[in-house]
Amino acid sequence: MAEKHQDKMTNAMNNSKLYLIQSFGCQMNERDAESLAGMLEDLGYCPTSAQEEADIILLNTCCVRETAESKVFGLLGRLRKLKVAKPDLILGVCGCMSQQEDAAKRIRRSFPFVDLIFGTHNIHELPRMIHQVQENHEAVLEVWATEKGITESIPVKRKDKLKAWVTIMYGCNNFCTYCIVPYVRGRERSRQPEDIIDEIKELVQEGYKEVTLLGQNVNSYGKDFKNNYRFADLLMAIDDITGLERVRFMTSHPRDFDQRLIEVVASAKKVCEHYHLPAQAGSNRVLKMMNRGYTREHYLELIRKIKERVPNASITADLMVGFPGETEEDFQETLDLVKQVRYDSAFTFVYNIRSGTPAAKLEQVSEEVKSERIQRLIELQNLISLENNQREEGRVLEVLVEGETKTNPDLLAGRTRTNKLVVFQGSGHLPGQLVQIRITKGRPNLLEGEVVPNGT
């Protein structure tokens, strides 16, 4: 049963205090950062982008890949001088990396100037832990070994005013052999549907047009309930919310994307026609070693069923190369899968060892081979992405305007329902408007277009 967040301590600070949160990793971490920011602003802190101005710096960490951990350790080393110059600065490390016992100990040992270390299960305790650091003038290390339910009503400070992340569940039960997430995020816990619905209704009242439902495996939503309420039921309920324009969700596990869910996403008016379905590999032998729980044939049949019901569906994926034991034949099967599915885009990455996972004990593929394979995969996917986007030329697509582009204030950018980035001229259109855009040029990573007068 959800408990209410009570540790606000609103008057503990004054408005001159500044905070900086630096997040690494996935959308779940981005959403956690919004909660961290919300709690800090409840304490009277204001955001800053300058490290030297901050009174508190939180590093919200990731441990899915070694590169993310290396970035954190490098940043901590550089922050040492700032901590010496500003001894009252509170420096904290949280998130998935600090949830690992070995990593937390390493931080404590190598960076003793860190004031605060906590994990993924107790971020709602942040106000109390800050108060403890200030009152006792000593470091606080609190990493809960296990999750203790879901804490609702944590303050949230969102950067975006049009699109919002909404977490619907936490944790993962899948235990893929390469992945550390179940060990640092805990077992699956679903939020109550009424809490999710209420949050989205409040967002709509605040002017938000689009929500993305988040979970390590959203398709597992509700499996921990005693009743039969599942993800498809939640989507139908959200689709009925007045004023909401678009609904997205991620991430989906291909094994759990069943026929009922396909029927719901095909019929729901607000659920966007974009499905992120991480394949990871195209070889049955590798998929089995990964403990993915499905075969290549199952995956391809799922894609066929989705496109049969949603012909204009955009499919994206995560694809890994260099899993331990992957042969050239295995890799060729991944390339063939990409050719058959024709992903609109894919997040491609090289396997790297995660201590504590079963795959870490297997015979590894050489770095040279992994580097060569990832380049071949990227080249293939870039070509397919370009071809897919060129097919959009001449079509008129609905675009949610997000604002000016970063490089040219005369150009606006937005997203189609299939999550394709569109750039166009149209200074009279305000962020949040839905406009009709005729696509004039397809590029590998975006579409160029022009506003259709009167939407016709």
Swiss-Prot record:
Listed CDD domains: Radical_SAM
Binding site for [4Fe-4S] cluster 2: C172, C176, C179
Record's keyword terms, sorted: 4Fe-4S, Cytoplasm, Iron, Iron-sulfur, Metal-binding, S-adenosyl-L-methionine, Transferase, tRNA processing
Subcellular location as annotated: Cytoplasm
The MTTase N-terminal domain, residue ranges: 17-135
Superkingdom of origin organism: Bacteria
GO cellular component annotations of the record: cytosol
Enzyme Commission identifier(s): 2.8.4.3
Catalytic reactions on record: N(6)-dimethylallyladenosine(37) in tRNA + (sulfur carrier)-SH + AH2 + 2 S-adenosyl-L-methionine = 2-methylsulfanyl-N(6)-dimethylallyladenosine(37) in tRNA + (sulfur carrier)-H + 5'-deoxyadenosine + L-methionine + A + S-adenosyl-L-homocysteine + 2 H(+)
InterPro entries the UniProt entry points to: Elp3/MiaA/NifB-like_rSAM, Methylthiotransferase, Methylthiotransferase_CS, Methylthiotransferase_N, Methylthiotransferase_N_sf, MiaB_methiolase, rSAM, rSAM_horseshoe
Cofactor: [4Fe-4S] cluster
Cofactor detail note: Binds 2 [4Fe-4S] clusters. One cluster is coordinated with 3 cysteines and an exchangeable S-adenosyl-L-methionine.
Domain Radical SAM core: 158-387
A GO MF term: metal ion binding
Residues binding [4Fe-4S] cluster 1: C26, C62, C96
Domain TRAM: 390-453
Functional description taken from the UniProt entry: Catalyzes the methylthiolation of N6-(dimethylallyl)adenosine (i(6)A), leading to the formation of 2-methylthio-N6-(dimethylallyl)adenosine (ms(2)i(6)A) at position 37 in tRNAs that read codons beginning with uridine.
NCBIfam families reported in the protein's UniProt record: miaB-methiolase (TIGR01574), MiaB/RimO family radical SAM methylthiotransferase (TIGR00089)
Quaternary structure note: Monomer.
Family: Belongs to the methylthiotransferase family. MiaB subfamily.
Protein name (Swiss-Prot/TrEMBL): tRNA-2-methylthio-N(6)-dimethylallyladenosine synthase
Annotated organism of origin: Desulforamulus reducens (strain ATCC BAA-1160 / DSM 100696 / MI-1) (Desulfotomaculum reducens)
Organism lineage: Bacteria, Bacillati, Bacillota, Clostridia, Eubacteriales
Primary gene name: miaB
